[in-house]
Amino acid sequence: MMIKTRNNAGAFVCFLFLALALATPSLIWRLFQERANRSSLLVFDLMELHALNADEGRNKFAALMEAGISAFMVPECTAEELGKGAIDQVTAVPAADLPDSVLKRFSYPSGTVVILRDPALAELQQEYLKRRFKNGEGVADGQTVYFKIPHPYVQLEKAGVLPDLRSMQYLSAAGVPLVFAPSPSMGSSGEELEESLTFLCGSFPSVKVLCPTGEIAAAYPDTELLGSFAKRHGLLMAQVEFSRQYGAARQVAAAWPNVVSLHAVDREEVLKRNIIRPLMLNRLYRAAEEREVHLLVLRLDPLRAVAPQLAEYCGDVKALRARLDENGFKRLWPVPAPSSPWINSFFSAIALQILFLLLLARYVERYFDISLLSRRRFLGVLAATAVVLGVFSLYAGILSRLGGAFAAGFLAAEASLVSMERWKVPLRGAAEGFLLVLVGGLVIAGRFSVPLYMYRLSTFSGVKLSLLLPLVLILLIDVHKREHPESLPEILSRPPLWGEIALAGALLLAAVVMLLRSGNYGFVGTSEIVFRDWLEKILGARPRTKEFLVGYPALVVWYYLKRQEMWSHWREVLRLAVTLAFSSAVNSFCHFHTPLPLTLLRGFNGWWTGLLLGSLLLFVGVRFGRPVFRRLRSLL
């Protein structure tokens, strides 16, 4: 049966915009929240304070805050760090290293001893240590206090012992916000950690954020303890981007909605990946611009040949702060995540199911040459099914995630097919495919425009599927509809050609690379990062590589080959490459932490730059490459 194209197209467009209308309240709420929370603050890690060289008599804190630092991260120093002089007049040694005259004053001679040599702070430091290690004991010898912890030094080398209370006193008195970073608690219990935190927050009201450090979350295995503490005391829990800390996710979940995003790059990553300073500054800016990160920790540059200077570091801070200010980032302290209206989720859930069922029906129509969307009864069943699935998905999140994942895949496939079936009017085809991605992408974004997804506490499982499913769908329908000269049985019944083997290997390799590179910085070289940053500065939003370098240029070349009836056996490669553009564009809408206007601008930039680049490549190929190829062929 032939498809009633005009009726089907009308029903398809009507239901598509119905879904968009239902998703609009969620999109408006998201845009309002993104505008209201456009704020980002720079944070300095106090662990690096001693490494900064400054002119004698200059106040480092004042200079840093004048440059643009808004908060300070206070790490809980480990025994190893105390032994290296991380805190003035404080050190930690094995008990066996003490003089016998001091050691014999303790009830037993083993353990780790924290030596406190500052009389003005010794009492406060002892109060913290007594709560952090209840079984510890302290003795005084003149103006020096020895506090012994009943755990061997090797156990406390990577465990939290004592923060820099002197700096905390100074900054808290000045009202400067503090980010306290408790280290792993191998030497104390969760109850002791909680008591020490209660004492610390009571003594220093400027502590606003908790940011656990180390490979293992503080209070492990009770990973929810720290998050619950933050929530009860009105603190924020830092959600560190790309963190590999064991137990961090459960800590953040326990603190919800008292969560704030934080981006930091440690010294080892900078050295390993050779991240030069301009790239580091741009990376932090992109974290704020593309992922709405509110706290940016700018550490010293380990790649500089000489010792870090305060003036140089302050120059970096000023440059980054100026760029943030110029682009509308305010200096407001972050607040707990808001709650979205329930009615928005209700409408957007139905919208997502309408989109998925609509795209599924359209693909079935294409594959089997039947008409579904022209039948009123079928449209009624589709609408009723969408409502039922939408309501159920509010209580079974798996339905929303599956619906979103498959809707994204079918959307990219449909956009690719729409654009390529308009090969007689190429510009119209490219525009219609892109508009379909925009409308469908907004519907998907509307369903997941809720704080849990915007703050990445819940992850969308359809990102990878939205990249791979369209390739499979296009390949199946092309073989079935004989877009490729051979049918699937014919291909399978003959031996594979060497060109097909090479092509299959290239496609498989490309798919693997695409999956590995679908993150922000994974498997991306320094030179490519420089190129990305240049594009971002020129265009305002960097187009994605799969769109402007691969997919849309492939669409332009395919249009030409189709119109000229050339290379019929190899055009399928270009058709599959075209799906990468639309898959990537849909994929951009699935990054729900990215501001929506940036997603729209990035998609548009990828579309027009890709078509322009494809046109230039086609012109060069036809004007210069084709004559050269003919001449070589005649010589052979």
What are these regions (language model features)?
Residues 33-342:
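Soluble extramembrane regions of membrane proteins in the secretory/endomembrane system
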Residues 4, 10-21, 347-636:
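Alpha-helical transmembrane segments of integral membrane proteins
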Residues 1-49:
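Hydrophobic secretory-pathway targeting helix
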Residues 1, 52-56, 420-424:
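Generic structural signal for short, solvent-exposed loop/turn connectors between secondary structure elements
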